[in-house]
Amino acid sequence: GQMPLHMRLPKLKGFKNPFKTEFQVVNLDKLAALYPEGGEVTVADLVAKGAVRKNSLVKVLGQGEISVALQVTVDAVSGSAKEKITAAGGTVTELV
């Protein structure tokens, strides 16, 4: 006879961590384009400008260069991004 459907379908393999934290990433080159004159960067500002979706964690990564002083207040910041922001005269505040 025909092989039953539940035996034809592949088994689920592996492990899914239910406590995994997913970040939406924003790189420095994107911040430089969104804030050409510098200023304060918050999660609400990034949502309003359409860079990230609301109700999720935001992490700033260090791809690209930045030359203006930014006051960044987001959930997480990578080490390279923190170095570049402070080198440009800005400040970093992490919420998590």
Swiss-Prot record:
Q: Which InterPro entries match?
A: Ribosomal_uL15/eL18, Ribosomal_uL15/eL18_sf, Ribosomal_uL15_bac-type, Ribosomal_uL15_CS
Which residues does UniProt assign to the signal peptide?
none
Q: Which GO terms describe its biological process?
A: translation
Q: Which domain of life is it from?
A: Bacteria
Q: May I have one GO cellular component term?
A: cytosolic large ribosomal subunit
Among Pfam families, the record links this protein to: Ribosomal_L27A
| The UniProt record lists the keyword Iron | no
Q: Which SUPFAM superfamilies match?
A: Ribosomal proteins L15p and L18e
Which pairs of positions does the record mark as disulfide bonds? none
Supply the Gene3D superfamilies for this chain: 3.100.10.10
**Keywords for the protein's UniProt record, in alphabetical order:** Ribonucleoprotein, Ribosomal protein, RNA-binding, rRNA-binding
Q: Which GO terms describe its molecular function?
A: rRNA binding; structural constituent of ribosome
Subunit-level organization: Part of the 50S ribosomal subunit.
Job description of the protein: Binds to the 23S rRNA.
**Family membership:** Belongs to the universal ribosomal protein uL15 family.
Indicate what this protein is called per its UniProt record: Large ribosomal subunit protein uL15
Origin species, per record, is: Streptomyces scabiei
